[in-house]
């Protein structure tokens, strides 16, 4: 009897009776309609909850939050609820018995409620997960990596262990959703080789993904942003997923995608056009500033004029309710919109002014950049900004922040660099990366040029600092050990520092690693050469050779960058036709995908090189393409839109003059008249000097026309006409009469009649911009202009600046003889 009683007591302790079975309690939790019902069940069953039940409870609580709007979420209320705290306490005891999936799901759910990372439950869950790491399947591993990322453990040994597991298992991973999560989490720890393997695996798995999986595509973009890699094939495929699912994208998703595209410098007119339509459909309550500010930032820069007006009117009404961050977002959007609405700008600035002390240094720089671009002036605001920036500069020891502060200070009126500031900069130089060094050089140059008042006290030290920066820059370039590391330095080089101090060292460094140039980096090297204005035929020949040999691996989006240095520097590689043909062939299947503006730039670059692919030109010069281009121009910044329109005109002119057999019509008369009527025709000192000398040589001002326009609107520095005996003809004596202002002197396509055997002469003074920086080699646009003028019947005399300003031509007589020689073929009249 006693034995039976003891067995009965043991059974009671081991298997206590529960009000509901495990399954029935889970079912009840899943049927709950709000958090309070879940908490009631937890309170009722506290003593009997199993590991499956606590896992279900956390999951159900999180699902409720996911279903709520931003305004409805009550994370704080749930986290601080007594039964939530009880649930956390109970869960700690069940951790060893949990399955891998339950363990990680509980950790994930708890993190969504913003529980502190040092909470005992989170520490216990992470510790247990670490022990089991090797046995986690890919899905569980991906969720766990997200939990670590939420705790900012990107560089932790635990994240490193996850990266190692992914590296070992990569070829067997079949789930792109899980892989995309892992890629984002471990992106800070991967090598270039591992990065390339991840990209290749992602491409292989992409076709297995349901096209509606927007989140997977967005995570792939996040990964590419984190590793700073604009991999066009993946970007393009993600872009198609977004476009197909545009009707399901909300404001937040579109905003994030646009920001990622901007960072990756990926331009998709098709996506922007679809997003513009989707955003315009959204009706948001004007009494909810957070959502409306997001809409203003996303839609404003690409909206049609009437929509922009509505957006600005509404944001003006909300301006006094904006937080510091919302005001910053609105200012950035106004910069993108090029909106100088003074009333709205003053309202936004008043909000910014209240919060200046709370902004990060990089945010202060953005504020100053935007206000400068929008031409906003406020002495009080700029004085406060200056004081704030100087105080931070004198206290900071972080190189990146010092670079930002110096940049911001130099953009303010009357910049002045104190001794303390110079010393602070000097102290951190060895720790600066190349981008920071370049920024310091740019802004030190600005200081030296503008700081006239304090020249005696500061310039000496500033010049010494510039010299140290030059030496450090050269040393960094010389120390690079491979092309990838060199590119990390070169991509930040720009402006005066590149052209005046480091161009020779940069080219020499590229030549050291010339054999490493391949399809993966060819566009980067070419884009850098385009910026240098430096002609190195060895590098350009290598680029052409790689393009021909590896054309099937080159993405069409890279072709413009590859062609550009050849076009700018006016260089034909030995395999010219094969090279240009390979580049054009690479683009042919993408002509419907490439942005209209990109095609215009590509067509023009090829035209400069006297290469006119018929398929490309037929694609561009038709009504459908031009309509798409007009739509794109509406949403682009005005400066870029103007550049594209001007390049289209130049391409149209080149095709009409050099390929008349294509029968492309000339349709830019009105555009050119608007453009050139804006030009006042004011001559600089050198031009005035030549004008006077030409008048003397030709027998009077009536025989020379300054700032003339040719047919098809080429601007000619000076024009004159010689008869068959090389006698100058005054303009009053024939059909061309001089005008008071610049404009058309004849129909743009019909050359005025000249006397028999007379010749029209174009005289051009070519400044330093017309030549390569290292040799007197004429650049592409100047060579094209000469070609066109000769087709139009001109004899072209180009006067290089280095000849005109040489010692041999230092006297007026020498220059007069030079002009006579070129005009009449004789040294003296």
Swiss-Prot record:
Q: Where in the cell is it found?
A: Mitochondrion
UniProt keywords (A-Z) are: Acetylation, Mitochondrion, Transit peptide
Main location class: mitochondrion
Q: Which GO terms describe its cellular component?
A: mitochondrion; nucleoplasm
Keyword check for Transit peptide, yes or no: yes
InterPro entries xref list: FAST_2, FAST_kinase, FAST_Leu-rich, RAP
Q: What Pfam families has UniProt attached to this entry?
A: FAST_1 (PF06743), FAST_2 (PF08368), RAP (PF08373)
The tissues where this chain's protein is expressed are given as: Expression detected in spleen, testis, colon, heart, smooth muscle, kidney, brain, lung, liver, brown and white adipose tissue with highest expression in heart and brown adipose tissue.
Positions where N6-acetyllysine occurs in the chain: 346
Its biological purpose = Involved in the down-regulation of mitochondrial MT-ND3 mRNA levels which leads to decreased respiratory complex I abundance and activity.
| Record text about domains | The RAP domain is essential to regulate MT-ND3 mRNA levels.
| Name of the molecule in the record | FAST kinase domain-containing protein 1, mitochondrial
Q: Which organism is it from?
A: Mus musculus
């Amino acid at each position: 009897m006693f034995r039976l009683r003891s067995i009965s007591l043991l059974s009671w302790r081991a298997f206590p009776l529960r009000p509901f079975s495990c399954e029935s309690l889970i079912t009840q939790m899943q049927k709950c309609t709000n958090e309070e019902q879940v908490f009631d069940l937890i309170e009722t069953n506290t003593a009997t909850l199993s590991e499956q039940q606590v896992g279900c409870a956390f999951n159900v609580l999180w699902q409720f939050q996911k279903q709520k709007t931003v305004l409805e979420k009550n994370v704080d209320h749930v986290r601080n609820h007594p039964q939530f705290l009880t649930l956390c306490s109970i869960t700690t005891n069940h951790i060893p018995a949990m399955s891998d999936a339950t363990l990680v799901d509980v950790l994930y759910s708890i993190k969504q409620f913003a529980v502190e990372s040092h909470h005992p439950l989170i520490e216990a869950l992470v510790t247990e997960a670490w022990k089991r790491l090797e046995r986690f399947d890919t899905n569980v591993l991906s969720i766990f990596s997200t939990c670590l990322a939420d705790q900012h453990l990107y560089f932790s040994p635990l994240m490193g262990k996850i990266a190692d597991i992914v590296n070992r298992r990569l070829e067997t991973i079949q789930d792109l959703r899980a892989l995309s999560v892992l890629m984002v989490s471990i992106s800070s720890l991967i090598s270039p080789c591992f990065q390339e393997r991840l990209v290749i695996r992602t491409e292989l798995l992409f076709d297995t993904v349901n096209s509606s999986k927007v989140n997977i595509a967005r995570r792939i973009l996040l990964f590419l942003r984190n590793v700073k890699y604009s991999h066009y094939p993946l970007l393009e495929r993600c872009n198609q997923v977004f476009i197909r699912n545009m009707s399901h994208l909300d404001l937040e998703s579109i905003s994030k995608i646009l920001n990622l595209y901007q960072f990756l410098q990926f331009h998709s007119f098709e996506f922007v056009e679809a997003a513009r339509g989707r955003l315009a459909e959204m009706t948001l309550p004007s009494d909810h500033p957070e959502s409306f500010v997001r809409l203003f930032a996303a839609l404003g820069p690409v909206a049609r004029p009437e929509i922009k007006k509505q957006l600005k009117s509404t944001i003006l009404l909300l301006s006094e309710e904006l937080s510091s961050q919302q005001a910053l977002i609105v200012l950035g959007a106004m910069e993108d919109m090029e909106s100088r609405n003074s009333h709205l700008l003053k309202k936004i600035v008043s909000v910014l002014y209240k919060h200046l002390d709370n902004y990060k240094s990089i945010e202060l720089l953005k504020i100053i950049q935007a206000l400068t671009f929008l031409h906003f002036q406020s002495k009080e605001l700029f004085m406060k900004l200056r004081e704030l920036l100087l105080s931070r500069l004198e206290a900071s020891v972080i190189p990146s922040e010092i670079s930002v502060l110096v940049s911001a200070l130099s953009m303010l009126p009357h910049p002045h660099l104190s001794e303390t500031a110079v010393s602070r900069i000097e102290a951190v130089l060895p720790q600066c990366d190349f981008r920071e060094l370049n920024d310091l050089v740019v802004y030190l140059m600005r200081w030296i040029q503008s700081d006239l008042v304090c020249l005696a006290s500061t310039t000496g030290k500033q010049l010494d600092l510039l010299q140290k920066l030059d030496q450090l820059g050269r040393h960094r370039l010389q120390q690079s050990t491979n092309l990838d590391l060199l590119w990390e330095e070169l991509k930040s080089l720009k402006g005066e520092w590149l052209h005046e101090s480091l161009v020779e060292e940069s080219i020499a460094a590229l030549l050291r690693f010339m054999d490493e140039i391949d399809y993966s980096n060819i566009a980067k090297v070419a884009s850098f050469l385009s910026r240098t204005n430096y002609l190195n035929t060895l590098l350009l020949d290598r680029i052409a050779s790689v393009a021909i040999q590896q054309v099937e691996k080159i993405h069409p989006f890279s072709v413009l960058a590859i062609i550009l240095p050849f076009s700018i520097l006016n260089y034909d590689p030995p395999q010219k036709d094969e090279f240009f043909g390979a580049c054009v062939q690479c683009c042919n299947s993408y002509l419907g995908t490439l942005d209209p503006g990109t095609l215009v730039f590509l067509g023009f670059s090829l035209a400069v090189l006297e290469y006119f692919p018929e398929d490309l030109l037929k694609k561009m010069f038709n009504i459908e393409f031009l309509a798409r281009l007009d739509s794109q121009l509406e949403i682009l910044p005005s400066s870029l839109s103007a550049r594209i329109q001007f390049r289209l005109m130049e391409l149209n002119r080149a095709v009409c003059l050099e390929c008349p057999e294509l029968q492309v019509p000339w349709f830019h008369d009105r555009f050119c008249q608007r453009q050139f009527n804006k030009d006042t025709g004011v001559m600089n000192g050198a031009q005035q000097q030549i004008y006077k000398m030409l008048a003397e040589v030709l027998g009077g001002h009536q025989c020379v026309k300054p700032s003339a326009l040719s047919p098809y609107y080429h601007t000619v520095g000076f024009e004159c006409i010689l008869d068959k005996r090389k006698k100058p003809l005054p303009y009053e004596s024939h059909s061309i009469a001089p005008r008071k202002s610049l404009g058309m002197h004849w129909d743009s396509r019909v050359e005025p009649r000249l006397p028999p055997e007379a010749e029209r002469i174009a005289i051009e003074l070519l400044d330093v911009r017309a030549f390569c920086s290292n040799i007197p080699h004429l650049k592409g646009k100047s060579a094209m202009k000469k070609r066109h003028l000769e087709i139009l019947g001109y004899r072209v005399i180009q006067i290089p600046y280095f000849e005109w300003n040489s010692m041999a031509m230092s006297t007026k007589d020498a220059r007069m003889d030079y002009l006579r020689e070129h005009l009449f073929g004789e040294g003296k009249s």
